[in-house]
Structures are given as C-alpha cells and as structure tokens.
Design a protein with these regions (language model features):
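Beta-lactamase-like hydrolase cores
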Residues: 25, 46-63, 213, 300-301, ...
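Short, well-structured active-site flanking segments
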Residues: 110-120, 195-198, 257-260, 360, ...
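A short, well-structured edge-of-sheet supersecondary motif
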Residues: 65-72, 76, 93, 212, ...
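Active-site SXXK
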Residues: 100-102, 106, 250, 321, ...
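A penicillin-recognizing enzyme superfamily signal
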Residues: 311-332, 339-343, 352-353, 359-368, ...
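Conserved catalytic neighborhood of penicillin-recognizing serine enzymes
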Residues: 130-155, 275-279, 391-452, 492, ...
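Non-catalytic, structured segments within soluble enzyme domains
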Residues: 133-315, 319, 323, 457-458, ...
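N-terminal type II signal-anchor transmembrane helix
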Residues: 1-68, 108, 128
Length: 574
C-alpha cells in the first residue's frame, strides 16, 4: 500500500512536471512568436517606408530572341542572344506544367495575396535557429516574380524579403493570378541559357511547351530552384529525383492521382537536346539580314528585342538558285559559285545562294561578301554611258584591232581580244555581242574612265573602283549582289533600286522606310531600252547564248584572266 502511494505521488509529480515543462515551452514559443511578430512588423514598416509605388519602378526588360522569316512567313531561324527566351500566352502552357509549378513553388498561390506569411515566419524561425543568414526561402511565386522583374541583383537578406513582400502585394492588386503565373513562367530561368518555359522546352525536349507530357512538365517545374544542380543533361539522377518530388507534391495536393504520379515517376527523362535556337535555313542570307539589323538597330536590340523580321527571300526562287548551282558546279573540287536574284522594280532580294554548304567551317557569303573582278560584265556600264551621252551604238563604228598605245594621260595601254581575232571596222552593237576588248578600251577612253565609274556607282555599285582605262573591261572588284542591283535600272526603265532584304520587324515596332523601295532615276527609259535591246541580242546570238532559256532575257557574260572568275549578269525587262 505504502509503495503504491509513493508510486502515485511520483507519477503525479512527474505529470505536473511534464505539464509545467509543456507550459514553459508553449510560453516560450508564444513569446518568440510575439517577438518575431513585433520584429517583423517593425522591419516591415522600416523597409517599406521609403519604397516607391510599383508604378514608378521600371521593370527589367527580359527581352526575347528575334526571329527571321521568309517572305511567306515561314521561320528561317532565331537570332541567338546571351539567353534564349520566347514569350507565349498562358493558354499555350499545359495545365500540368502550371499545376506542377504551383505545387512545388507555392502551393497556396491561389489563396494568398502575394505573401504567404506562414511560410515566411517558418523560414525566418528555421534560419534564426540556424546561425543567421537567410538560407531557406519563404518566397511566393509573386515574390519571385518581383525579384526577377524589379530587383534581380538585390542581396538575399531579410530586408529584401520584406521589400519583395510589399511589392508582391502591390502586384497582386494590379494583376490576376493567371497574369502573374504567365509572367512568372515566361520569365524564370530554367538553365542552359533558357528563360521561360518555351525556351526550356525547346532546349530540353526539342519541342514546343504545349507538346510536352506530365513527366516532362514536372521536370521543368523542378528546375528553377537550382537550374545547374538539376540540369538533366549534366545530373540526370538528381534531375530525376527532383522531378519525382514534384510529381509527389502534385499527387499530395490533388492535382493528379497517385497512380498517375507513380506512372510518371517510372518514365525516363525523355530528353532530346534541342537546336531550335541554333538551327537556321538559308544561313548565308540569314547572316546577311542579321548583320543589317545590327547595323541599323544595334546588337542588344537585335539579340533581345523580340523582333519578328519578315524578309524578302522567296523559297521557290531560292531553291531554283541552289539547284542551278548544284547542277553545274556541285562536285567536290568545283570552283565556288554564287547566285543573287533581285526584283528590279523594288530591289527586294528574292534569292541568295552559294555553292558552299553553310556551317561552322563555311560562313563566308560569296554572294554578298566576295569581291571579284567582273570582267566583261562591266562593259555594260561603258555601253550605258555611251548611249546616255547620245552615241548611236548601231552607227558608231570602232576599229577592232590590237591596242598598243602610249596614252598621254594614262601611259602605255596594251589590249587584245581573247581569241586574238579582229574584225576591223565594227559598230558598237556588234562589238558588244563579240565582247571585243579592243573596241571597249577605246570607248572607255572616249567617254572617260571616271564617267564609267560614275555611271556604275549611280546604277548601284558600291565598292571602291579604280579610275583607270581598264575599268571598262572589269578591272575593279565587286560582289554579285552589287552587280545584280546595278543591272536593275536596265530592267525597270532607268531607276536605281537599293537591295532590300526585310519588309517588316513585327507588331508595334516602327520600321520607318525599311521596306520602302528607294527608286532614283539615273537615266531615261530610252537609254534602258537601247541597252536592253543589245543585251537581248547578246543572249540570242552573242556570248550569252547559254542564258537563252526564256523570252526577253538580256545580259552580259564576263571572264577574267586565266578564267579565274566567270560571270553572267542578266535580267528580264519589266
């Protein structure tokens, strides 16, 4: 009996002791909570007192890749930037990805007003008990959005969390939950230079985000917390573990069933390294457009401005140009070749092709960058100058003979024909069909080399040209693009047109006179008619016979010494 009473007294004292200890712990927690609450309120007032209204703050421009399209609206490629980003509306983002993101990042997203105070206090307590610095996050999706848009480089301390909390509440008052989620999903970093879900999906799965499945959505949702650590290309095991955590959270929160979660967990990562932001069609033309954009608007605007550039390139004509090259100079060891097609009325570049496949080892654009001597194709400018001066090409006769003179202005001049055959007295028209060098050197001296250069420049040649008698025989260096543009006035009745590669930059972006044809009259249409008449005969019965493939084709061949370069510049009059 005595022993029982002693046992009961000890148990009673122990019970009282446990109750007392519980009360002490409870009181301590209440005191700690009160202190933290007061401290939080005081800090909140202190930090937010001088904060500007969010409308007065300038959000960071996230930017996105500019895109280049052909004339029909089919994409040629993306212009690479420091990061890749393509903004899309929330409706194109799968529900699975939205729910996965909310489940792992902010499960009370649809319940709070921008700040999850329970989560923040919990994070503060854990970090206070873990020697100071803020290592465990209490940020909601809205707070993360605020940081990304307004304070991306701010320090990660408690004051900054309060600042983000205040601004997050302002954001919640101005935008709907769907708008906030869309901004977040389009602006968060997913690793591999990818910002936003579309860039991430194209990078990790090589498909647009609206085409991904549940396990892929869960993988993406898990990346923002630590993009490098969970990079599936580098750390597939950790990425799988993180993905499965996301899937389990989705199941626990009722977004999917446990069976769906288990099935998705059993799935492979389903990775496919995407090259969307690297791939490009018509690489030489693409680079030509990119450089022109940079020259006009600067590299930063071009890389991150989200331009949607509609170009002038015509896929059908581009294929025809490529096939023409491949059918004639497509074998290994063949010389390099280039073709440029320009609409003579507008200057729109419809095709730009070369014989070299575009790639890492070949990015030199023979069509726009290769300066070569044009040979006899330059005789057209001498002919145009002469006709514009009133010389009749049918009645004006020159002596076709070897030239070996010592000109008082230009010094010794020696010129022969390629075949070393001469016709004696011959009208200019016939000398053109025979591409007679001896006649054209005399014509160049008569009209003046400087005036040949002048008419060539006015018609569209932009390269520096030597003012020498041999300029009439093509001793200067020009690009195929320049020559195509310079022949355009002969096809359109006497108007110089500037080559145009782009017609539009996208909605809301002023394009100025970007696509407006720049037509400047350089000679009367009668001059164009007479030159064309002779160059048409040159195709039907002169040196340009190989180009006689359609009615009304006019043009001129050109060959340099030792056949180093061979040209044909032609057109159909409009």
């Amino acid at each position: 009996m005595k022993i029982d009473r002693l046992r009961r007294r000890r148990e009673k004292r122990a019970s009282h002791g446990r109750i007392g200890l519980g009360r002490v712990i409870l009181m301590a927690l209440l005191v700690l909570g009160t202190v933290l609450g007061v401290a939080l309120a005081t800090s909140y007032q202190s930090v937010t007192a001088d904060l500007p209204d969010i409308d007065e703050m300038q959000p960071v421009g996230l930017g996105q890749n500019s895109r280049i399209y052909d004339r029909n609206g089919k994409i040629l490629g993306y212009i690479a930037g420091v990061t890749n980003r393509t903004e899309i509306p929330l409706a194109r983002i799968p529900v699975d990805l939205r729910e996965a993101t909310v489940a792992i990042e902010d499960k009370r997203f649809y319940e709070h007003g921008g700040v999850d105070w329970v989560r923040i206090v919990g994070a503060a307590v854990r970090n206070a008990m873990d020697s100071g610095g803020l290592r465990q996050g209490g940020s909601t999706i809205t707070m993360q959005l605020v940081k990304n848009l307004y304070d991306p480089d701010a320090p990660r301390d408690f004051s900054q969390k309060i600042r983000e909390a205040h601004l997050a509440q302002e954001v919640e008052r101005r935008f709907t939950k769907d708008q906030i989620l869309a901004k977040y999903l389009n602006g968060v970093f997913y690793g591999q230079n990818s910002v936003g879900v579309q860039a991430a999906s194209l990078t990790y799965f090589d498909k647009p985000v609206w085409a991904i499945n549940l396990p892929q959505a869960a993988l993406l949702a898990g990346l923002p917390q630590a993009p490098s650590a969970y990079n599936p290309f580098v750390n597939p095991k950790d990425a799988t573990t993180r993905r499965n955590v996301v899937l389990q959270e989705m199941a626990d929160q009722g977004h999917i069933t446990q069976a769906e979660a288990d099935e998705a967990k059993a799935s492979d990562l389903l990775l496919k390294r995407g090259r969307t932001y690297e791939r490009k069609r018509e690489g030489y033309f693409f680079d030509y457009v990119r450089q022109e954009l940079i020259d006009r608007y600067g590299e930063q605007r071009v890389q991150n401005g989200g331009l949607a550039v509609r170009t002038t390139i015509d896929p059908r004509l581009q294929r025809a140009a490529e096939q023409a090259i491949a059918g004639n100079l497509g074998q290994e060891g063949d010389p390099a070749a280039a073709v440029v097609l320009i609409d003579a009325r507008t200057g729109y570049i419809r095709a730009m092709a070369t014989s070299r496949e575009y790639g890492k080892d070949s990015q030199f654009n023979y069509a726009a960058q290769a300066r070569r001597q044009p040979g006899s194709t330059f005789k057209t400018f001498v002919l145009t100058r002469a006709i514009a001066d009133g010389i009749n090409p049918y009645s004006t006769v020159y002596d076709s003979r070897p030239i070996d003179i010592n000109d008082p202005r230009w010094g010794p001049i020696q010129v022969a024909t390629y075949s070393n055959s001469y016709r004696g007295a011959v009208p200019i028209s016939q000398a053109t069909l025979a591409s007679d060098n001896t006649v054209y050197i005399q014509m160049t001296l008569d009209v003046g080399p400087e005036r040949v250069v002048d008419i060539a420049k006015k018609m569209g040649v932009q390269s520096d040209l030597p003012v020498v008698p041999s300029i009439g025989l093509g001793s200067g260096e020009v690009t195929p693009l320049e020559m195509a543009a310079a022949y355009a006035p002969l096809a359109n009745g006497g108007f110089r047109v500037k080559p145009i590669a782009m017609t539009d930059l996208g909605t809301g972006i002023p394009k100025g006179d970007l696509a407006t044809p720049k037509r400047t009259r350089v000679f009367q249409d009668g001059v164009a008619y007479e030159v064309t008449r002779i160059l048409r005969d040159n195709v039907t019965s002169g040196t340009g016979g190989a180009a006689n493939i359609a009615p009304n084709v006019a043009g001129k061949t050109g060959t340099t010494d030792d056949y180093t370069d061979a040209w044909f510049v032609g057109y159909t009059p409009r």
